[in-house]
Each structure stands twice: as structure tokens, then as C-alpha cells.
Amino acid sequence: YNINVIVMVCREIELGKKKCERYWADRGDSKRFGDITVTLSKKEDLKDGYCLRTIKAEKGNEIRYIKQFHYTSWPDHGVPKTCLEILSLINHVRDVQSYSEDETTPLCV
């Protein structure tokens, strides 16, 4: 699949427990996963409780750019007090997906 949008709705650590593996690099760094190199091209902290990362993934001569939406305001325990931030995130994701060259490309959540 040629995934170009990833949506992540959990934090890396919640209630002191690791919830996901960090598969992106910090700005200025790269990470290797086998023969794939991942670099953070851009990070935008947005006002609606999430950030948008542009991740560059390289394997040999192939380069892909992936947009990762990371909702960082989900509380450690429970649910958000309002759905407005989630709705803003969904609208932004749909907006970015509408610019995709292949409309059949799945969304990775």
C-alpha cells in the first residue's frame, strides 16, 4: 500500500505505560528500521490538540512523504471533555487526503 496519511490518537506513554513504539525521528535526526530510513521533515504543533508531522521514508532510491496527525490531548484516563478538537482533526485529515494522487489509498489509524 502507498500509505500517505497516518492518524495516531494515543500518546506514547499513558499512565506511565508505553502505549506505542516511536516510529518517527526527532527533528534533525534519522531512524533506521532495517533498510528503511525515516527522517522528520517538518512538525507543526496545531492549536486543536494535535500536531502534524511530515515524515520522509527512504528505501534505496524510493522516497515517500507521509503526513502523520498525532492527537496529543487525549487524557490519560477517560475521554476528551469535548469533541471539537477531534472534529477539527478529522476535517484536517480529510482535507489532506483530498490532495492525494490516489483516492483509493487507505488511511492508517
From Swiss-Prot:
It is an enzyme of class 3 (hydrolase). It catalyses: O-phospho-L-tyrosyl-[protein] + H2O = L-tyrosyl-[protein] + phosphate. Transmembrane segments: none annotated. GO terms for molecular function: non-membrane spanning protein tyrosine phosphatase activity. Its EC number is 3.1.3.48. The keyword Hydrolase applies. Substrate binds at residue 76. The keyword Hydrolase applies. One of its GO terms (cellular component) is cytoplasm. Keywords: Hydrolase, Protein phosphatase. InterPro entries: Prot-tyrosine_phosphatase-like (IPR029021), PTN12/18/22 (IPR047170), PTP_cat (IPR000242). STY 3 and STY 6 may represent a double domain transmembrane protein tyrosine phosphatase. PANTHER family: PROTEIN-TYROSINE-PHOSPHATASE, TYROSINE PHOSPHATSE N18, PUTATIVE-RELATED. This is Tyrosine-protein phosphatase 6. It comes from Styela plicata. The lineage of its organism: Eukaryota, Metazoa, Chordata, Tunicata, Ascidiacea.
